[in-house]
């Protein structure tokens, strides 16, 4: 497996896609379909995390879109992402770093208020445009994120490359990987393109985020609006991204790193920047531990866990999802045993 090997999509495929797409959608693109085609590159042999079991990895490869569907999905995503956005004279790149379920969405909202022209790079946001998104959500909701992951990461890479070539401000959301590092972030390319790059890190304990991926999923299902962004993240992926951030933050320029904690209810739940003279890795570790402790002491974990259990029972959740929640509860018990004062 080698993420560096990529291939392009043919002009014949482009013409087929153009003939099937609504002219209004084509007109909404930030450049001509022909220009965008040059950025529509796909990995030939994508790297898949070692934490993914062999059967699921094979299914992920099997669910890759055809070139025609891939290009059509890219066009629809770009029409949405670049709508009413302006290019920048002095482009900036804001890199949002956190494990899955840590609350990157709230931090994203806060940063976008300062610069609404920013292009959001978030692979989950493009999945809803896949022609098979609804079918996958219906037949295998547990693995929706994984089955659509290869194409969505490639779409994110295509959109990033286009945005950089045209000097758009960027906001890249990343749940890092031990194997792949800052997925979708090429720091050297950003530097070469003249971007001022800053890192914004959410410091949230693993008990909170591991349960949050379940709570978020149940909330979306309860509202009756599952879509391409509705997924139950695999717990192994969550745990890997949690550990990866500990490693990666030590390699970043401390001057370019800002760390945030989750805001309380009295603070409007907005992310609060932590001002501390310590090294970023120390700030991250301390804030994570403190958030876990508060979550346990205030009864938050048991309350949310009970709520999720009731929701799962009500909808007769698949056994795989129940098993994953049981693993999260084991994490909680282990944490209690290792921290007797709690």
Map each language-model feature to its residues.
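N-terminal pre-Walker A segment at the start of P-loop NTPase domains
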Residues: 52-87
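Pre-Walker A (Motif I) flank of P-loop NTPase domains
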Residues: 88-94, 166-168
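Hydrophobic positions on the alpha1 helix immediately C-terminal to the Walker A/P-loop
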Residues: 107, 111
């Amino acid at each position: 497996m080698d993420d560096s090997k990529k291939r392009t999509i043919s002009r014949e495929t482009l013409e087929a896609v153009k003939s099937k797409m609504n002219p209004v959608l084509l007109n909404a693109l930030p450049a001509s379909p022909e220009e965008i085609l040059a950025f529509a590159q796909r990995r030939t042999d994508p790297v898949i995390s070692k934490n993914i079991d062999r059967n699921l990895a094979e299914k992920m490869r099997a669910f890759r879109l055809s070139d025609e569907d891939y290009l059509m999905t890219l066009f629809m995503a770009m029409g949405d992402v670049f709508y009413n956005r302006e290019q920048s004279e002095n482009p900036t790149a804001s890199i949002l770093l956190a494990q899955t379920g840590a609350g990157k969405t709230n931090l994203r909202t806060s940063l976008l208020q300062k610069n609404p022209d920013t292009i959001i790079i978030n692979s989950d946001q493009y999945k809803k445009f896949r022609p098979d998104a609804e079918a996958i959500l219906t037949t295998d909701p547990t693995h929706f994120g994984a089955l659509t992951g290869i194409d969505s990461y490639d779409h994110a890479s295509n959109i990033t490359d286009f945005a950089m070539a045209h000097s758009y401000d960027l906001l890249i959301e990343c749940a890092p990987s031990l194997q792949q590092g800052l997925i979708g972030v090429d720091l050297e390319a950003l530097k070469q393109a003249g971007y001022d790059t800053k890192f914004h890190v959410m410091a949230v304990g693993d008990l909170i985020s591991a349960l949050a991926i379940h709570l978020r999923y149940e909330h979306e299902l309860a509202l009756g609006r599952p879509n391409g962004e509705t997924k139950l993240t695999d717990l192994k992926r969550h745990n890997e991204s949690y550990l990866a951030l500990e490693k990666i933050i030590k390699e970043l320029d401390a001057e370019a790193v800002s760390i945030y904690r989750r805001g309380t209810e009295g603070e409007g739940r907005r992310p609060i920047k932590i001002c501390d003279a310590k090294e970023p890795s120390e700030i991250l570790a301390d804030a994570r531990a403190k958030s876990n402790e508060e979550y346990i002491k205030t009864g938050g974990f048991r309350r949310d866990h009970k709520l999720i259990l009731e929701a799962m029972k009500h909808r007769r959740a698949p056994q795989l999802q129940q098993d994953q929640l049981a693993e999260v509860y084991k994490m909680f018990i282990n944490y209690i045993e290792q921290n007797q004062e709690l």
